[in-house]
């Protein structure tokens, strides 16, 4: 996960593309769940959760700020960190990337692969069915 940002046209909107490594995701999850947090709060929480030392967490925070995923405000002598991207937006981007990279953009291939290996609970089957019906109805109204 090298640092890179590019402008991307997505359904008519220009969005900043932010690629996150697995470690950066862990730190972002902590911020999405509890924001804002001080540098000390984050380094202590990540040490307890992952065993990372202080400099590892601070390096990840710096990289996340460079990528535009995290904002930092100075409050007195403390730095306070906030997520600058919504979890939903980051997850949607990662999902589109996976779909394009692994399944050539085919959602049906992804669903097929995921359901071949293990049985889906009836609740999830019902949710997928409802989503497909909703998409079909929207298609006929457009």
Residue ranges and their predicted role:
Residues 6-30, 104:
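Short alpha-helical segments that sit at the start of domains
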Residues 6-14, 116-142:
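C-terminal regulatory/oligomerization modules of transcriptional regulators
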Residues 1-4:
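Short, small-residue-biased leader/transition segments that mark boundaries at the very start
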Residues 17-23, 75-93:
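Short, cationic-aromatic polyanion-contact patches
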Residues 68:
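Glycine-centered, phosphate/nucleic-acid-interacting loop/turn motifs that mediate DNA/RNA or nucleotide
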């Amino acid at each position: 996960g090298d640092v890179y940002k590019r402008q991307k046209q997505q359904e008519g909107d220009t969005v900043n593309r932010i690629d996150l490594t697995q470690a950066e995701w862990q730190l972002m999850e902590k911020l999405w769940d509890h924001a804002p947090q001080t540098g000390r709060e984050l380094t202590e929480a990540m040490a307890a959760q992952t065993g990372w030392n202080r400099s590892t967490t601070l390096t990840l925070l710096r990289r996340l700020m460079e990528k535009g995923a995290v904002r930092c405000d100075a409050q007195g002598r403390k730095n306070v960190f906030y997520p600058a991207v919504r979890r939903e937006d980051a997850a949607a981007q990662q999902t589109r990337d996976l779909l394009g990279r692994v399944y050539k953009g085919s959602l049906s291939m992804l669903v097929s692969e995921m359901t071949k290996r293990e049985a889906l609970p009836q609740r999830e089957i019902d949710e997928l069915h409802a989503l497909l019906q909703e998409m079909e109805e929207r298609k006929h109204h457009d």
